[in-house]
A protein has these predicted regions:
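Small-residue hinge/turn detector
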Residues: 140-152
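Glycosyltransferase-associated regions of secretory-pathway enzymes
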Residues: 1-139, 157-355
Length: 355
C-alpha cells in the first residue's frame, strides 16, 4: 500500500486536492450561473398543488388569475346561502380552452389572490382580505410584480381560446418591450370634454419579457397610486393605469395589440356586445387573426339581466344555440382550424400549475 508520506503519496495527495478544488470551483460558478432560474422554478414548485412536468422546459409562463369572492350565486346547501367557490361554471370551460390550446408552448399557472404572498418576495398585502376597489388595485399591482419577476402572459380566465397564443405573445415582445391588448373603454373620464374614446389599453391581457424596465416603471407608478389617500375614490372612473399605459404606447415603450385579436371587435371593427355573445346570430370574427373571444365576465356579474349566464351549468350552456356556446365547443374540439402552426414535439407535454 502506498504511504501518503512517500514521495509518490505526497504527489498523489496534491493532485487529488487540486482536482477537488477545481471541481468545487467549477460547481460554484455553474451554480451561480443557473441559480436565478433554478430558484425561480423551486419557488413555484414549492407552492404547486399538483405535480407538473414543468421543469426542464424553457417555456414562458401563462398566468390565469381567478377570484373566489364571498357570493350567493350558488349555494353549497339549502342552509348555506353563500360560499367562496368560483361558482361560475362557464369559467371552467374557458380555462380548459386556454390550457388545451396553449399548454404545449406555455407553462400555465393557475393563481388566486393568495398566490401573491407565496410567489412575490416581500409581498405582505393580503389582497383577498381587502375591500373593493382597493382589492382590484393591489391585485393589478401584484400581477405586474409577477410579470416583472417571471415574465410571461396574463390571460383573463374568461377568454375562450381558439388558437395557440404563442405567436401573439412572441410577436408582442419581439422588440423586448411589453404589450397590452385593446379593450372597450369603460372609463367615464375618457369621454369627457366631447371626446368619445371607444377603445383603450387594458392590463388584464398583457405580456412582457422577464425583468422589463417598463414593467418596473409601471409598478412604481401603481405604488404611488396606492399611497394616495384618495386612490379608493372611483379609480375605474379615472382609469389612471390605462392613461399611464396609453402614454407609454405613444412613446413606443409598450406595444398595443388590436382588440380584433382577442375577439372584442368584429372584422368590421365593431364592438362585440354581451347581447351578441348570448344571441344565436353569427358574429363576424376574423378567421385568420382572431385568437379567441373575451367574455366580459365582470359585466356579466354586475348587470342583473346577464347574471343567469354566470350560474348556468356547463352541459346546459353547450346545448344552446348561443354564439358563445358554439365557440366554447370549437375551443374544446380536437380539430384545429389553423394549419399555419407547426406541430410541437410530442416530448413537450401540457403543463398546468395550480398555485
Amino acid at each position: 500500500m502506498m504511504s501518503i508520506f512517500s514521495e509518490n503519496g505526497i504527489i498523489y495527495t496534491i493532485i487529488t486536492i487540486g482536482i477537488v478544488f477545481a471541481v468545487n470551483l467549477f460547481g460554484t460558478q455553474l451554480k451561480e450561473a443557473i441559480s436565478p432560474e433554478s430558484e425561480e422554478n423551486e419557488l413555484i414548485r414549492k407552492y404547486l398543488l399538483n405535480e407538473s412536468p414543468l421543469y426542464g422546459y424553457n417555456r414562458p409562463k401563462l398566468w390565469i388569475h381567478s377570484t373566489y369572492e364571498y357570493n350567493a350565486r350558488t349555494w353549497k346547501s339549502f342552509g348555506s346561502r353563500s360560499s367562496t367557490d368560483l361558482n361560475q361554471p362557464y369559467i371552467h370551460l374557458t380555462v380548459r380552452s386556454i390550457v388545451k390550446k396553449c399548454g404545449q408552448d406555455f407553462n400555465v399557472c393557475l393563481i388566486d389572490d393568495d398566490s401573491f404572498n407565496q410567489l412575490i418576495p416581500n409581498w405582505t398585502v393580503k389582497v383577498s382580505e381587502l375591500p373593493e376597489p382597493a382589492r382590484q388595485t393591489f391585485r393589478d399591482l401584484a400581477m405586474c410584480e409577477l410579470l416583472f419577476i417571471y415574465g410571461g402572459l396574463l390571460v383573463p380566465n374568461t377568454f375562450v381560446c381558439l388558437h395557440n397564443l404563442s405567436t401573439l405573445y412572441h410577436s408582442g415582445i419581439e422588440l423586448n418591450t411589453p404589450f397590452v391588448c385593446e379593450m372597450s373603454n369603460k372609463y367615464g373620464s375618457f369621454n369627457s370634454g366631447g371626446n368619445n374614446t371607444k377603445y383603450t389599453s387594458n392590463t388584464r391581457f398583457m405580456g412582457a419579457p422577464k425583468r422589463s424596465p417598463v414593467i418596473r416603471e409601471m409598478i412604481e407608478y401603481l405604488k404611488i397610486r396606492t399611497d394616495d389617500p384618495h386612490f379608493n375614490s372611483e379609480p375605474d372612473f379615472f382609469g389612471y393605469t390605462s392613461k399611464w399605459v396609453n402614454h407609454e404606447i405613444l412613446r413606443e415603450k409598450i406595444k398595443l395589440i388590436d382588440g380584433l385579436h382577442i375577439g372584442i371587435k368584429t372584422i368590421d371593427n365593431k364592438t362585440v356586445e354581451i347581447d351578441e355573445l348570448l344571441d344565436s346570430e353569427p358574429i363576424k370574427f376574423s378567421p385568420t387573426e382572431t385568437y379567441g373571444l373575451l367574455i366580459p365576465g365582470d359585466e356579466i356579474l354586475k348587470r342583473t339581466c346577464y347574471q343567469w349566464f354566470s350560474v348556468m351549468p356547463v352541459d346546459e350552456i353547450l346545448k344552446t344555440n348561443m354564439v358563445v356556446a358554439k365557440y366554447l365547443m370549437a375551443s374544446l374540439s380536437d380539430n384545429e382550424v389553423r394549419d399555419d402552426k407547426k406541430k410541437v414535439s410530442s416530448s413537450h407535454e401540457q403543463t398546468v400549475m395550480t398555485i
